[in-house]
């Protein structure tokens, strides 16, 4: 018997709901009550705030246990993260769906199989996720082709529209960081394709491929680190909340406040790995389209690189603004644009990328998504090796 059911009622679930049921309920309701969906409702922001608080309390085992036993008086409100931030980290912003699609975590949360009972068919879930991911990539590739077609028709108008997009998307939760991540992949993938024109073993092309490969591996390791950090934080919070008499209320509040950033940063790392892997494949579909002529593909690559650089400028602009820099929403402190100098080493280029966060030991483990008592690995698409990397470039762009 729970003392209060208000948070359960807000999510529309019973007090016996599983973690998966709570997550799915939040995913559905958050998209319904999000302020962007209800611009004329003066209560929209409040409703979204309450929904976010309910989800954060009930999705944390320690907080949920305290809420069930004592109601709202037993939970730490200081540990509540801005609902707009947590929504963006879990499911992304709808403003960015035309660029990154539905994030993998959102796809996992929305799978119907989550409510089918305690028995999970991991192979079936993996196959569903692969299908959803393929549909996501194909849809994004078509959108990107249409967008780059504007570059072919009118370059000046394309640049003007891209700059307007930056102004619009920068206002979304973590919009600047999203733009920076998207811009980085666009620039690197375009540079790799444009490098195919070189002779002498296609050295620029191979260099870009190795840079992309190295960045991809680093991104996956960082994602694993993020998952591991979340696991450690969850276990430590359980330990802190279950220990009696060894801490003051002020000490516990300080601990929870200090780890807000760890939670957001860890979720961000997982999302970055998903976004980057997806966009790499999308760019390959667009820039290696067998139905397009060679010169058209080169024009697409030039347009993609231009778009990526415009997106990356949002990060530089925000970091030159003291008001932007003072906001706690910032995830990174590095301000160097990824493509200020394309001749710099991969190491220096990576140093400013948005996967960076607090210096943590790199985990050698691959993240495993857990369902009930079973686990399975969700593999993001890997970048394809450069065809003919060890041969003279005869099949690339001439």
From Swiss-Prot:
Query: Which InterPro entries does the UniProt entry name for this protein?
Result: DnaJ_domain, DnaJ_domain_CS, DnaJ_X, EMIR, J_dom_sf
PROSITE patterns registered for this protein in UniProt:
DNAJ_1 (PS00636), DNAJ_2 (PS50076)
Task: Output this protein's name.
Answer: Chaperone protein dnaJ 10
- Chain intervals for the UniProt region annotation (Disordered): 315-398
Composition skew (Polar residues), residue ranges: 326-335, 343-362
Write out the entry's keywords from A to Z: Chaperone
Q: Cite the J domain residue spans from the record.
A: 6-71
Presence of keyword Cell division? no
Q: Output the Pfam families linked to this UniProt entry.
A: DnaJ, DnaJ-X
In which family does this protein belong, per the annotation? Belongs to the DnaJ family. C/III subfamily.
Role this protein plays: Plays a continuous role in plant development probably in the structural organization of compartments.
Checking SMART domains in the record gives: DnaJ
Record keyword Chaperone present: yes
């Amino acid at each position: 018997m729970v003392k209060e059911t208000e948070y359960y009622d807000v999510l529309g679930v019973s007090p016996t709901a599983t973690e998966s049921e709570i997550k799915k309920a939040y995913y559905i309701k958050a998209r319904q009550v999000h302020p962007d969906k209800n611009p004329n409702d003066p209560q929209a922001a409040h409703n979204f705030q309450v929904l976010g608080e309910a989800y954060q309390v009930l999705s944390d085992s320690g907080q949920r246990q305290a809420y069930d036993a004592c109601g709202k008086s037993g939970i730490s409100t200081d540990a509540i993260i801005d609902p707009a931030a947590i929504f963006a980290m879990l499911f992304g912003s709808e403003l960015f769906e035309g660029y990154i699609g539905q994030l993998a975590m959102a796809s996992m949360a929305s799978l119907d199989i989550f409510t089918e009972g305690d028995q999970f068919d991991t192979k079936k879930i993996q196959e569903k996720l692969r299908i959803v991911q393929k549909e996501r990539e194909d849809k994004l590739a078509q959108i990107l082709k249409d967008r780059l077609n504007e570059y072919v028709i009118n370059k000046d108008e394309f640049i003007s529209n891209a700059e307007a997009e930056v102004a619009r998307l920068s206002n979304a939760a973590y919009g600047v960081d999203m733009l920076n991540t998207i811009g980085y992949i666009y620039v690197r993938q375009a540079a790799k394709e444009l490098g195919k024109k070189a002779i002498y073993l296609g050295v620029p092309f191979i260099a870009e491929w190795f840079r992309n490969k190295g960045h991809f591996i680093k991104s996956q390791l960082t994602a694993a680190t993020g998952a591991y950090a979340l696991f450690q934080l969850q276990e430590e919070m359980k330990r802190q909340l279950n220990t009696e008499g060894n801490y003051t209320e002020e000490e516990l509040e300080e601990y929870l406040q200090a780890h807000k950033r760890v939670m957001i940063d860890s979720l961000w790392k997982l999302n970055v790995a998903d976004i980057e892997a997806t966009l790499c494949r999308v760019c390959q579909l667009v820039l290696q389209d067998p139905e397009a002529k060679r010169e058209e593909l080169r024009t697409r690559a030039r347009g993609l690189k231009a778009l990526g650089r415009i997106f990356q400028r949002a990060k530089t602009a925000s970091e030159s603004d003291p008001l932007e820099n003072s906001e706690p929403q910032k995830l990174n402190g590095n301000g160097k644009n990824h493509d200020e100098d394309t001749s710099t080493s991969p190491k220096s280029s990576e140093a400013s990328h948005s996967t960076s966060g607090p210096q943590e030991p790199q985990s050698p483990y691959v993240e495993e998504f857990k369902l009930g008592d079973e686990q399975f690995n969700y593999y993001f698409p890997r970048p394809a090796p450069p065809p003919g990397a060890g041969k003279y470039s005869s099949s690339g762009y001439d």
